[in-house]
Regions:
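...captures the hydrophobic TM-helix bundle architecture rather than a specific catalytic motif
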Residues: 1-199
């Protein structure tokens, strides 16, 4: 007979715990949003090349290289901000967080300028053709998430400047960071589908 006391335990009490409610909530939100984006991306891919009238993506789209670099770079800066907060370095946290906000704002500004050019110069609206409908739906959906993220980033910065953000609130800041990484990751998919495959 095997002595149960001699068997190694897979884990000891206290070695693990359930994730916090915040983490469960943000992961659930991200999964839900990912499903929504998947549907819209699939619709965009399905309708590629099916517009009966112009303009076409090849005729009017310009690849947003600089704004894409800025948005993806914001994932690096927010990661550096998180690290600074864990080390209780408020100055560096605020600096990197502010840079993240500026990069996000630049991306939104570039998107707005692109839309202005498409509408005023090329007369591409959401009603022009299937390309216009799917383009504004997909890019607009992503832009709306960037706006939400930018509002959250700004709220955190204001709270930090008022002395309300410390290392004790790191998990809350991490949740904002997770959301922002998700927004950036989605843009990689949108960029690939719209500006690479779709052209």
């Amino acid at each position: 007979m095997i002595n149960d006391a001699s068997l190694p335990l897979a884990f000891e009490p206290g070695d693990w715990s359930l994730p916090s409610a915040r983490k469960v909530a943000i992961v659930s939100l991200i999964l839900t949003e990912a499903t929504l984006f998947s549907i819209v991306v699939a619709a965009y891919v399905f309708y590629i090349g099916k517009s009966l009238t112009g303009p076409t993506p090849r005729e009017v789209l310009e690849t947003p290289i600089i704004s894409t670099i800025c948005l993806l770079g914001s994932s690096v800066t927010i990661m550096l901000a998180e690290r600074a907060l864990r080390r209780e370095n408020q100055g560096r946290f605020q600096l990197w967080w502010m840079i993240t906000i500026l990069l996000a704002a630049f991306f939104l500004g570039a998107t707005a300028l692109e839309w202005h050019r498409l509408i005023t110069v090329h007369h591409l609206t959401i009603r022009t053709n299937l390309f216009g409908t799917t383009f504004y739906s997909l890019v607009g959906l992503h832009a709306s998430h960037v706006i939400v993220g930018l509002c959250l980033l700004t709220l955190v910065l204001v709270s930090s400047l008022r002395g309300l953000v410390t290392a004790k609130q790191h998990e809350r800041i991490q949740m904002v960071s997770w959301y922002w990484h998700f927004v950036d990751a989605v843009w990689v998919v949108v960029f690939t589908v719209v500006y690479v495959i779709g052209r």
